[in-house]
Amino acid sequence: MKPSIYGLTRDELIAWAIDNGQKAFRATQIWDWLYRKRVQSFDEMTNISKEFLAILKDSFCINPLKQRVAQESADGTVKYLFELPDGMLIETVLMRQHYGQSVCVTTQVGCNIGCTFCASGLIKKQRDLNSGEITAQIMMVQNYFDQRGQDERVSHVVVMGIGEPFDNYQNVMTFLRTINDDHGLAIGARHITVSTSGLAHKIREFANEGVQVNLAVSLHAPNNELRSSIMRINRSFPLDKLFSAIEYYIETTNRRVTFEYIMLNKVNDGVEQAQELADLTKRIRKLSYVNLIPYNPVSEHDQYSRSPKERVAAFYDILKKNGVNCVVRQEHGTDIDAACGQLRSNTMKKDRQKAATART
């Protein structure tokens, strides 16, 4: 399968065009066709010579994704299941917000982080997505707007789908530079958030990139014992290493870090844990924010359940009394396969059942 041209940054596309005997402005024209006019075929690029179009077609495809499923929620959330060229499946989510249209993208096929509450890790990592496959997710949603004649654009991006973004670092960075490019989609860096489960060394590397993209950290527990029991990654990057990297990030970028904290009933949602969390984040309080996330139950992880509203409220109150900037996250798509990885997992189960039935 040819690589997607979406996998190139504008500078890389210019270099490729020059290597193929073209002037730099040809690459700029192609970039405009891809991201401003958003064509679906190289043949639609009417100001590109037939000879150069032939080279383009021999070298690249445009969009490598095929839509398998689209579930639309009553609140306007759309959950997509896309098929990759090798037949593997990934999820992408469109969330309609009061401030714009936000898309959550996937960076890996499966996940090896091993969080015990998460649907994404039910199927182990099979491979990284390349940068073109990540960018194509944004283009699929933008095409959805365009085809409906909706004067809307993808304005915000969260890199929080299946997989650990910092375990696919270079492809994610290429993706970020592509969607942020002022000559293309021009999605503002401050409208983009990358979430990590806590790869401390990559947080430091990210701090040195000089990008204005937001950082979120999946914390989910305020002490090492509990965090190691629900997030295997903590055994490699315990809280002292993680927070050292976070402090370095804040000192280097002067940017706020968001902590994601999923509320698991009688696991991590007690008043003691709330106080521990307040104490843990005290040193970086001015440049940190806690996002309390209602749990979407996963049948394979039935040892966990959603925290009742009164426990969430008590937890929230303790954080606020300690001066912690925090919010209970607004839910999206609760009437569809809401948990990250759930649509993919359920579809793969159905595919296996169909295959088994066909054999009998």
Swiss-Prot record:
Catalytic activity as recorded in UniProt: adenosine(2503) in 23S rRNA + 2 reduced [2Fe-2S]-[ferredoxin] + 2 S-adenosyl-L-methionine = 2-methyladenosine(2503) in 23S rRNA + 5'-deoxyadenosine + L-methionine + 2 oxidized [2Fe-2S]-[ferredoxin] + S-adenosyl-L-homocysteine; adenosine(37) in tRNA + 2 reduced [2Fe-2S]-[ferredoxin] + 2 S-adenosyl-L-methionine = 2-methyladenosine(37) in tRNA + 5'-deoxyadenosine + L-methionine + 2 oxidized [2Fe-2S]-[ferredoxin] + S-adenosyl-L-homocysteine
What GO CC terms are in its UniProt record? cytoplasm
Q: Which residues form the signal peptide?
A: none
- All copies of domain Radical SAM core, residue ranges: 97-335
State whether keyword Nucleus applies: no
Could you tell me which CDD domains the record lists for this protein?
A: Radical_SAM
Q: Which UniProt keywords apply?
A: 4Fe-4S, Cytoplasm, Disulfide bond, Iron, Iron-sulfur, Metal-binding, Methyltransferase, rRNA processing, S-adenosyl-L-methionine, Transferase, tRNA processing
Under Enzyme Commission nomenclature, its number is 2.1.1.192
Q: Which residues bind S-adenosyl-L-methionine?
A: G163, E164, S195, S218, L219, H220, N296
Highest rank taxon of the organism: Bacteria
Give the PROSITE patterns listed for this entry. Answer: RADICAL_SAM
Disulfide bond residue pairs? C104-C340
Q: Which HAMAP family match?
A: RNA_methyltr_RlmN
> Tell me, what does this protein do in biology?
Specifically methylates position 2 of adenine 2503 in 23S rRNA and position 2 of adenine 37 in tRNAs.
Q: Which family does it belong to?
A: Belongs to the radical SAM superfamily. RlmN family.
Any extra remark in the record? Reaction proceeds by a ping-pong mechanism involving intermediate methylation of a conserved cysteine residue.
Name of the molecule in the record: Probable dual-specificity RNA methyltransferase RlmN
Its taxonomic placement starts with: Bacteria, Bacillati, Bacillota, Bacilli, Lactobacillales
